[in-house]
Amino acid sequence: MFDFIKSIIIGIVEGLTEFLPVSSTGHIILAEALMKIPGGMVWTKSFTAVFDYAIQLGAIFAVIQLYFHKLNPFSPRKTSREQFQTWRLWIKVIVGVLPAMVFGLLLNNFMDAHLLNPWVVSATLIIYGIAFIVIENRQKNIAPVVTEVNRITFKMALFIGLFQVLSLVPGTSRSGATILGAVILGASRFVAAEFSFFLSIPVMFGVTILKVGSFLLKGGSFTGAQLFVMLIGFVVSWVVALFAIKVMMRYIQNNDFKIFGWYRIVVGILFLILGIAGLVKM
């Protein structure tokens, strides 16, 4: 029973935080530390590591479901020009993904081995929280240059992708880094969030394939119970992410990202306190 409860809770946390600029990794670690969720035979160390990445696909399916028409170049409801624009958008997404793909392959293991600790996570939560507040204060009197996602240039997509590389540091938040970068480069908040969602599709698919593939190539395997627990987390993450994305996009139509900045600072301080107390272990 606790195996399923743990899967549901982590799925909820993943779905809520994957696309908000607040660090899903940090929140999953916090959830496990604060609630001391017990796990049975299912939750081996190797399975837990794979599970945390696999359920991200549920959140990605939420993006695909919500933006299927916009991202589908084969839609019969689109004109030939609109289909062409969709293909161009996908090429921009690929351009934006390339920096994270290259640096991720080179640095991923190093980051996990040396930077996945309470001090780094708390520091990045706080630093980027401050950055959101500072950038929003700077941007409040500056009109965005890019107000439609199709108007993002290839150069801009590449630079947003370079910001995404920052999210390799635990606690940064992939969506946080890309949204912040896009806003700095002149995108509206709405466009910044949308493009961040689109970038997540190839990135998360790639990371999940890399992690699960590595696990299987090393001789790992899943029991029936583990596959069922993973399926539960996947579905919960999918459903909750649908809700989180809709709420966030409605919110930023008339509000800025400063609330997320303040929230990150509070969570970062909490993370630091728990780390000092020895309650957060990685």
UniProtKB/Swiss-Prot annotation:
UniProt feature coiled coil, ranges: none
Any Gene Ontology CC annotation: plasma membrane
Top-rank lineage group of the source organism: Bacteria
Catalytic activity: di-trans,octa-cis-undecaprenyl diphosphate + H2O = di-trans,octa-cis-undecaprenyl phosphate + phosphate + H(+)
Top-level EC class as recorded in UniProt: hydrolase
Upper classification of the organism: Bacteria, Bacillati, Bacillota, Bacilli, Lactobacillales
EC number: 3.6.1.27
Keywords attached to this entry: Antibiotic resistance, Cell membrane, Cell shape, Cell wall biogenesis/degradation, Hydrolase, Membrane, Peptidoglycan synthesis, Transmembrane, Transmembrane helix
Function recorded in the entry: Catalyzes the dephosphorylation of undecaprenyl diphosphate (UPP). Confers resistance to bacitracin.
Native species: Leuconostoc citreum (strain KM20)
Transmembrane helix is among the record's keywords: yes
UniProt protein name: Undecaprenyl-diphosphatase
